[in-house]
Each structure stands twice: as structure tokens, then as C-alpha cells.
């Protein structure tokens, strides 16, 4: 489902009551929601240019981030954690946070700021979920405890490798994280997957347990996508997210705790990777 966010909602920095209910219901039932055109395009353009340069650095390094621990052509690649590339409408978007706080409650925190790049010629990932269930063997499973906030830089079409999503699978609490072909084919007969196509400025929010996979990028463009992960406040916290001093202002109005530390000196953000809430 996609919600067309109005100019009035953008001005008020929150969704209307009806749109908020649709967003929350969609995440509970389908496992995801797309919020339309809530990130300014000029910020995405600046990030896209920098992240494309960084992609070439990763590829030329012959790092396993290029060959991929999962699939060739899908890079683990974070956005630069320093000014002028940190924007409040990305790291603390008020519309996104309105959804996250309503869904997860006050005290929700961010445990991840990184991303991935789907490069031209990539192959299909294995079907997977980003986290398991807190309590196993519940069907339907427990309510959402964490969401991934995906922010692409460009229009993401099927040709450009739009993510494959399996609606409703976040509730299958009696299925382990190891999703083999038999599990996949059984679910396909019940409800087939959809493609999470988005327009520039859209944001995709999905339950971390939702089955999904990266698809082949058949275009000649890199598809960069930033990822944050918002957690319910009572979960244990990992290490703070590292940013470089000079961008603190971007977080001043954040309703979701940024769980951030601001370093005096830059660090090797392309190769010093930390997983979600680690």
C-alpha cells in the first residue's frame, strides 16, 4: 500500500488521522507501507552523487562488500555520516517518526544508519528476513517491534531492482529464519510476492521480519538506498550510531531517539560496518 502524503501533512509534520491509521494497519497486516514524496529531491540528489562515487571506491577495493556475503552486485554501503550529507528529513523525518512512534510507542530508538546499493548486473538474493521473532512458534506472531526505514535516492522500478516483498509473512511466527525453497514455494501458492516500486522522495517502512529479497538490477544505474532501523524502546540497545561532529543540528527535533554519538574525527564508514543494533 502507498499513501499519498499531502502538502498540508508535510507542513504540519504529521499524517492526518485517517492516513496514520492506514499506515499502522498496513504495517500490522501487510508488513509494510510506502509514504509518498516526503523527502526533498535536492537532498537525495546530493547523496546520490556522493554514494555513487563511494560505490566505485568499494568495487575497486575488491572487498567482499562488492562480491557480497549474500549475492553479487548488492553492496553493503552506508551514507556518509557527516555534513553536508546529513539531513533532518532523512535521519529524523517527522512523517516517518510519526508512524514509528505511533507503532512502537514513546521511547523508540534508532539502531542503524547504513544502507545498500544494487549495482547494474546484480543477481537475485535468497529470500530472507532481517530479524527473527522475539517469541517463536506464535502464529500469528507478536506485534511489530522493529521497522526498517528504506529511503531510495531515485525512482525504483522493477528494471532497477525494486525489492521483492512477501505481504503478511511477518506474522508467520512458526517459520524459522532459514527460508528454503520448499517454504518459499508453499507461501507463493498462498500469496505471491509483490515488488516494492517507489518514486523519488518516497519512503518504504517495513517490519524487519517481513520476507523479502533484493532483485536483479537490469538498468545501467546504481540504486542506492539508505536504511534506518527503529526499535521499540524496551529492547536492549547496541552501540550508539556514529556520526562526525558538525551535524548534530539535524537531530534536534527527532521524536525517535537517534541513539547517536558524534566523533571528533572521521572514520572509515565504507568498510567499518556495524550491523543493526550491534
Predicted regions and their residues:
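Active-site glycine-rich loop that binds ribose-phosphate moieties when present
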Residues: 129-137, 151, 181, 185-189
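Non-heme Fe(II)-dependent double-stranded beta-helix
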Residues: 1-30, 35-138
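Short acidic/polar capping segments at secondary-structure boundaries
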Residues: 116-122, 132, 153-158, 169-172
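Short, conserved beta-strand element in jelly-roll/cupin
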Residues: 137-158, 197-200, 228-232
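Short edge-strand/loop segments of extracellular domains
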Residues: 118-119, 166-173, 229-235
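Non-heme Fe(II)/2-oxoglutarate
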Residues: 2-12, 61, 203, 210-278
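Generic beta-strand structural signal
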Residues: 106-113, 123-125, 145-151, 161, ...
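Double-stranded beta-helix
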Residues: 8, 156-215
Amino acid at each position: 500500500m502507498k499513501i499519498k502524503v499531502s502538502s498540508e501533512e508535510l507542513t504540519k509534520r504529521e499524517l492526518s488521522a485517517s492516513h496514520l491509521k492506514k499506515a499502522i494497519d498496513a504495517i500490522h497486516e501487510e508488513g509494510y507501507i510506502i509514504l509518498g514524496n516526503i523527502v526533498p529531491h535536492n537532498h537525495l540528489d546530493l547523496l546520490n552523487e556522493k554514494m555513487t562515487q563511494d560505490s566505485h571506491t568499494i568495487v575497486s577495493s575488491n572487498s567482499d562488500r562488492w562480491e557480497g556475503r549474500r549475492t553479487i552486485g548488492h553492496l553493503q554501503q552506508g551514507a556518509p555520516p557527516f555534513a553536508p550529507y546529513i539531513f533532518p528529513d532523512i535521519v529524523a523525518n517527522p512523517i516517518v517518526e510519526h508512524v514509528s512512534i505511533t507503532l512502537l510507542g514513546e521511547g523508540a530508538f534508532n539502531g542503524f544508519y547504513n544502507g545498500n546499493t544494487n549495482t547494474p548486473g546484480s543477481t537475485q538474493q535468497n529470500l530472507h528476513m532481517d530479524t527473527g521473532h522475539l517469541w517463536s512458534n506464535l502464529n500469528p506472531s507478536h506485534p511489530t517491534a522493529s521497522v526498517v526505514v528504506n529511503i531510495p535516492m531515485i525512482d525504483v522500478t522493477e528494471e532497477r531492482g525494486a525489492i521483492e516483498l512477501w505481504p503478511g509473512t511477518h506474522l508467520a511466527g512458526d517459520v524459522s529464519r532459514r527460508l528454503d525453497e520448499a517454504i518459499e514455494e508453499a507461501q507463493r501458492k498462498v500469496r505471491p510476492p509483490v515488488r516494492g516500486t517507489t518514486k523519488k522522495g518516497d519512503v518504504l517502512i517495513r517490519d524487519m521480519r517481513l520476507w523479502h529479497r533484493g532483485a536483479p538490477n537490469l538498468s545501467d544505474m546504481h540504486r542506492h538506498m539508505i536504511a534506518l532501523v527503529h526499535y521499540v524502546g524496551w529492547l536492549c540497545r547496541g552501540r550508539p550510531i556514529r556520526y562526525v561532529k558538525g551535524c548534530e543540528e539535524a537531530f534536534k527535533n527527532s521524536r525517535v531517539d537517534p541513539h547517536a554519538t558524534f566523533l571528533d574525527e572521521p572514520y572509515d564508514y565504507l568498510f567499518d560496518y556495524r550491523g543493526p543494533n550491534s
